[in-house]
């Protein structure tokens, strides 16, 4: 490390007399006065030792900066607004279809409300009468037909908008008798992309679920699952 210290408080004044010729050719004495400062220089001993090394090769006869080589000139380019994008974590999950959107925005919301809508029993609709009613005509009697909670209903997602109820009857009817097919429609009258298929028997619904889940239908792959709540309507 080399540093220089100048002490302005202790200048050394010196005078120089110089004889010069003016424009007329006459000799004139010029007196110059100046101040000399004491400068203290600290040098690095290791640097001074390296300067005494013997030069060789192409730098044998060169001195000073002549034997200093510079690398390629590099320009610094600063880009503004460069950010690394991180993968967005899915923090929103629908409670109906388990996909990444709010439950209120779920396209299957309307259809689920239809299947989960409670039905009025015959006891609520008909007033109580003192007249005798046969057991097979009394409210709540369904005979051998399954109750609403036992009806096997399948929700078919990722359905082509070109599919009709007739198409689904033919597709799902090969596994057993189908009692009902429902394709919810939008305000414009087009399919919402899913449907509900209700079987008469649970084993038929299980066969359809096993065979058609992941089945390619009209350039789409069907996704099947049992509806959370089954209804005859």
Curated annotation (Swiss-Prot):
Disulfide bonds: none annotated. It holds the Pfam family eIF3g. Its main location: cytoplasm. One of its GO terms (molecular function) is RNA binding. GO terms for cellular component: eukaryotic 43S preinitiation complex; eukaryotic 48S preinitiation complex; eukaryotic translation initiation factor 3 complex. GO terms for biological process: formation of cytoplasmic translation initiation complex. It comes from the Eukaryota. SMART domains: RRM (SM00360). Keywords: Cytoplasm, Initiation factor, Protein biosynthesis, RNA-binding. It is found in: Cytoplasm. Residues 152-229 form the RRM domain. RNA-binding component of the eukaryotic translation initiation factor 3 (eIF-3) complex, which is involved in protein synthesis of a specialized repertoire of mRNAs and, together with other initiation factors, stimulates binding of mRNA and methionyl-tRNAi to the 40S ribosome. The eIF-3 complex specifically targets and initiates translation of a subset of mRNAs involved in cell proliferation. This subunit can bind 18S rRNA. Belongs to the eIF-3 subunit G family. PANTHER family: EUKARYOTIC TRANSLATION INITIATION FACTOR 3 SUBUNIT G. Component of the eukaryotic translation initiation factor 3 (eIF-3) complex. This is Eukaryotic translation initiation factor 3 subunit G. It comes from Dictyostelium discoideum. The lineage of its organism: Eukaryota, Amoebozoa, Evosea, Eumycetozoa, Dictyostelia.
């Amino acid at each position: 490390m080399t540093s220089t210290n100048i002490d302005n408080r202790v200048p050394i004044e010196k005078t120089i007399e110089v004889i010069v010729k003016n424009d007329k050719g006459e000799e004139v004495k010029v007196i110059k006065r100046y101040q000399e400062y004491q400068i203290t220089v600290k040098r690095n001993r290791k640097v001074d030792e390296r300067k005494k090394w013997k030069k060789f090769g192409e730098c044998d006869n060169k001195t000073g900066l002549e034997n200093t080589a510079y690398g390629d000139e590099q320009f610094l380019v600063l880009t503004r607004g460069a950010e690394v994008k991180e993968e967005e974590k899915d923090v929103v999950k629908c409670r109906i279809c388990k996909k990444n959107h709010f439950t209120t925005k779920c396209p299957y919301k309307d259809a689920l409300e239809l299947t989960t809508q409670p039905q009025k029993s015959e006891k609520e609709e008909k007033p109580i009468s003192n007249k005798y009613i046969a057991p097979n005509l009394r409210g709540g009697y369904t005979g051998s037909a399954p109750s609403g909670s036992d009806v096997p209903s399948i929700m078919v997602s990722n359905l082509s908008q070109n599919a009709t109820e007739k198409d689904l009857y033919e597709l799902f009817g090969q596994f057993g008798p189908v009692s009902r097919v429902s394709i919810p429609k939008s305000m414009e009258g087009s399919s919402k992309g899913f449907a509900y298929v209700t079987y008469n028997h649970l084993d038929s619904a299980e066969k359809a679920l096993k065979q058609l889940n992941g089945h390619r239908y009209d350039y789409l792959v069907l996704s099947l699952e049992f509806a959370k709540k089954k209804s005859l309507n």
